[in-house]
Structure formats: structure tokens, C-alpha cells
Amino acid sequence: MYYYKLKKKTIICIEGKDAISFLQGIISNNTNKLLNNRAIYSTLLSPQGKLLHDFFLFREKNKIYLDPVDSGVEKLNEKLNLYKLNSEINISKKKIFSYFLFFGKSINKILGLKNKLGEYKKLSYAKVFNDPRNINLGLRIICNSKKEDVEINKIIKSKKLIMNYDEYEKTRIMNCIPDIDKDNLYNNAYLLQYNFENINSICWKKGCFIGQEVTVKMKNRGSLKKKLFTIKSFTKKFKSPEEIKYKNQIIGSTTSHFNNIALALLKINKISNIRKKNKVIII
């Protein structure tokens, strides 16, 4: 079992009587799923349907917390305030003390979580939740004080967790999980192209959200020409970006990688005859 301590220092808090309805009208997932014991994953798109932000959400009473990548906090905060208009909400940035990833087989049991996507608990020493995208990505831990951080480090020591971010990256790529920074997705990616439909970021039944029209049209028309896949080579290590060829034809390019595995945006009509193993394309 493994852990990694991120350099993350800020999350966003939205509170007020219109908090749920405000988010419901702009993000791709359904805020009605956001219970006190459940975290969800969602995105905020441009009106043209391209990805601007992705984030986890969890709720504590009348407060909703958005947990984006650190590089996206400022832009997301600005965008939320732009859309706020007359909504009776308060949007603020909240400092945190530390942020951990725990991952590996049955890792959730260490902190008393079930093997359930998005399960959330506020413990006496931290906020913890299973990653709602894919259970193989383990759990996330937010500490608000040095005291909480010390408690988590005691658990790391007692359970003999190994610090290894490379193992996390390997798991992310093998499960075809895009990363907005590493895969260069900001304002470049459509959700259906980059596997967001399969990592619990979209609710098709919730009603309108920003960028919905473009996203729904792509789904209904089946107009995708390229899609994100996990690829693997037994003969080389990948780079990113790197052109991917099959029978001397360019079929796509990598977006992020770890040694001999990578995420790659590939032409759908060019991969039908390529060998696959457990949904991984062998190049």
C-alpha cells in the first residue's frame, strides 16, 4: 500500500441558500447526489463544451467544498464568481494544512471506509473520501491543521505505507483516467473524447449545464473521431506528446505517460485491428 503527500494548499467553499441550485445549473454532474456521506466528481465546461475545470465536491451541512487541482483554484474561483450573478451564495477560498493520497489494495479499510466510490467521512483528525472516479485510485485525505497532519503521519508509519507517486501515475494511466494538467486538457478537450463519461463526471438526466448542448449532440450523433485509450509497449518507453504509428500510419499521439504505458488520443477507425488486452491497446 502506498501514499503521497500533495503540495495542495487551497480548496473552495460555497455556502448559502442557493449553493446547490447554483452549482446544479453550471456543472456536469448532479448536485442532488451530493450527500453528507458522499463525494462526487464533476467538471465545468466552456459554452463550446470544452473542459475548463474538474474537481471533487463534498458537503458539510450547508457548505459545499470544491477540490480542484491547485493550478486551477484561482481561475475556477474567478469563473464561479462570474456566474454567481444574483445567487444568494458566498464563495471563498479556504486554506488547508496538508493533502494526502492513499492507494493500493483495500487501502480504504485503513480509515474505516467501505469499498464504495465517493464514500466520504469527516473524522476527528481529517476529511477523507474514496476517489469517486475509480476505486483503484484509492482515497484522498484533507488535513486542516498540523495536529491532523501528525495523526495521518502516525497512520502512515504504523501501517508501513510506502511513498510512491510513480505507482499512482501507473494506476491512473492503466485505468484511463485523464489529468487536466498532465494531459494538457484546459480548454482543449471534449468530455466524451477524454473518457470523462466513464469516470462519473456527467449526469445525463440532471438537466442543463454549461456546455451541455455540445456534449449531448456528440453523444447522440456518435460523431467522435478520436478517443482516449491506454496504450502499452513491450519494446519502448513513451514520451509525451509523441506520435503513435501503426503499420507506418499515424493513428494519434500520447498525452501523458509512465515508462512503457501512456494515455493516447487515437483515431477510432484505425484501432479495430490492433491487439488489445484488458482494454489496453498494445502498440
Model-predicted regions and their roles:
Residues 1-205, 209-283:
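Basic, glycine/lysine-rich polyanion-binding surfaces/domains
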